A protein has these predicted regions:
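Transmembrane helix-loop-helix hairpins at membrane boundaries of multipass inner-membrane proteins
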Residues: 1-6, 23-116, 190-202
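Structural signature of hydrophobic alpha-helical transmembrane segments
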Residues: 2-13, 81-92, 134-147, 206-209
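Short hydrophobic "helix-edge" motifs at membrane interfaces and signal-peptide entry regions
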Residues: 3-5, 16, 71-73, 122-124, ...
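Small-residue faces within membrane-embedded alpha-helices
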Residues: 12, 36, 47, 93-96, ...
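Short glycine/serine/threonine-biased micro-segments
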Residues: 15-16, 34, 81-83, 91, ...
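Hydrophobic residues within membrane-embedded alpha-helical segments of Major Facilitator Superfamily
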Residues: 17-20, 39-42, 88, 94-95, ...
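Alpha-helical transmembrane segments of multipass membrane proteins
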Residues: 18-23, 48, 97-101, 123-127, ...
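Alpha-helical multi-pass transmembrane bundles of energy-transducing inner-membrane proteins
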Residues: 27-29, 116-120, 124-209
């Protein structure tokens, strides 16, 4: 399978699967569980050709996919992986399977919504690890917080409301600061590519900020 198809499949298969589980609904909770398990296993299976096709002898990004996204902002749908992101992607896909299995009989209410949230979260996390465009990374990062917020707030423990509020405040503040930093780096480099950011001759003071 070509790398261009592979990374996008790893991202959008669990997201699409999550939406399908959501469409199944709680009226067919058993089907929702099985569909979630099948999608999580299929996503994990896609990691096999990714791992086999990865060349560990080079430090450059591999499985590159680069398409226009928001031309007005010089943002691209730019994906790729290196030796750091590869194991994180595999770990994410691997851990989703036991999460689905462990929740099989524990979650009895809003079953479809629960499994949909985890599958969508999986796809968005993989997107975070694949994104080579900072704005695309920011999109995946921010979108990832939505299913996390729902999982904590709906299926969390006794203090889930407090935990959700605290989670929101921390992530909102961090997201604002991250966005400011990305805009600053964009103004310095002229695009949102991670490689462009890495090549910037930033002063020590700028790096500390």
């Amino acid at each position: 399978m070509h790398g261009i198809d592979l990374l996008s499949l790893l991202i959008w298969l669990p997201i699409g699967g999550g939406l399908a589980v959501l469409a199944v609904g709680d009226a067919h909770a058993r089907l929702a569980r099985w569909l979630a398990l099948i999608v999580s296993l299929a996503t994990l299976a896609l990691c096999v050709p990714l791992w086999q096709g990865f060349d560990a002898t080079t430090a450059s990004f591999q499985f590159i996919q680069r398409l226009p996204w928001i031309p007005q902002l010089h943002a691209e749908y730019y994906l790729g992986i290196d030796g750091i992101s590869l194991p994180l992607i595999v770990l994410t896909a691997f851990m989703t399977v036991p999460v689905v299995i462990a929740s099989w009989s524990v979650i009895e209410k809003r079953v479809a919504q629960y499994f949909a949230a985890f599958l969508i979260l999986e796809g968005l996390m993989i997107g975070v690890f694949c994104a080579l465009d900072a704005l695309l990374f920011y999109f995946f990062w921010e979108a990832m917080l939505i299913p996390m917020f729902l999982i904590i707030g709906i299926w969390g423990g006794p203090r889930r409301v407090y935990a959700t509020l605290k989670f929101f405040l921390y992530t909102f503040l961090g997201s604002v600061l991250m966005l400011v930093a990305l805009i600053y780096l964009y103004l310095k480099s002229g695009d949102y590519t991670i490689a462009g950011f890495q090549s910037l001759p930033l002063t020590l003071q700028e790096q500390c900020w």
